Amino acid sequence: MKKYLALALIAPLLVSCSSSNKKGAEYNEAWVKDTNGFDILMGQFAHNIENIWGYNEVLLAGPKDYVKYTDQYQTRSHINFDEGTITVETIAGTDPRGRLRQAIVKTLLMGDDPNSIDLYSDVDDIQISKEPFLYGQVVDNTGASIRWEWRAARFADYLLQTRLKSRNNGLRVVYSITINLVPNHLDKRAHKYLGMVRQASRKYGVDESLILAIMQTESSFNPYAVSHADAMGLMQVVQHSAGRDVFRSQGKSGLPSRSYLFDPANNIDTGTAYLAMLNNVYLAGIDNPTSRRYAVITAYNGGAGSVLRVFSSDKVQAANIINSMAPGDVYQTLTTRHPSAESRRYLYKVNTAQKSYRRK
């Protein structure tokens, strides 16, 4: 869900709104200010990394990338949840092996609480967990899963002896180790959240397979997921748009905090509640459940307003046009005529992923 989603969700086109235009303008102004402020901070952070690592070496956390810097930003751990790799690198001029060893051990044994780690600082706040987040997703050179510090340390020593690489980036020498996750790492992560998904599914009447497909597409089941639009967590919920809408529908004031949305259970609950709102409120005028599902999926990414405007500028007429079409034609229209290329691809990705979860 992108940051412009907030504007689409409060548009009169979608829902009747009792607040005045002045209040709406104030809401939009505050949202833009917060979002622009976040963009500025991220730009400054990226600039600092570039100054230390070099021009083509900027690496930041994202929806499907965990990136944590330590050692005055000279060492970093990167988990690419799409490719299934862990890469630990350092440009430290002193004891690079020791710094890599420590980073490997801590990355392998970190927990799954995003609120405990600041991805936008070099503070070494990674706590070794008795239940590591990556347990079962990576195995050592003997084929064993890694839960204990002694095993992680032994594996780190093995990696330093057999897989250490170095390269010169023109500014620094970069030492690195790459570890592959197990082939079914995606399923391993998904399994961690099945209980939460089932609970949210029952609570809001949203199909489990759709929730899982959204999570896979948004974050690849990365609880640390962040984005340039300040979307957070497993379902990439934006505080000022979907988060605020859900809170309002639940009789809560304000919007969910960052710590609230980085809690996996809260994130799944909020994301699922928003899917239910799209289905039962914003896009309720679409009669065919399959057509409505296609619209809901696309709206989760780009807003309900943009979905309806593909068919007509009038929301009632848009629903009537959709209702006159076969579901396959609705899918074809949304994947070819939606103004956002990202939203067009999003429907294809989520629909494909949902089919795989329905078969499981």
From Swiss-Prot:
Please report the name of this protein according to its UniProt entry.
Answer: Membrane-bound lytic murein transglycosylase C
UniProt-listed GO biological process terms: cell wall macromolecule catabolic process; cell wall organization; peptidoglycan metabolic process
Gene Ontology molecular function, alphabetical: hydrolase activity, acting on glycosyl bonds; peptidoglycan lytic transglycosylase activity
Q: Which NCBIfam families match?
A: PRK11671.1 (NF008670)
Q: Where in the cell is it found?
A: Cell outer membrane
Q: Which Gene3D superfamilies match?
A: 1.10.530.10
**What GO terms fall under cellular component here?**
cell outer membrane
Q: Where is the signal peptide?
A: 1-16
Q: What is the lineage of its organism?
A: Bacteria, Pseudomonadati, Pseudomonadota, Gammaproteobacteria, Enterobacterales
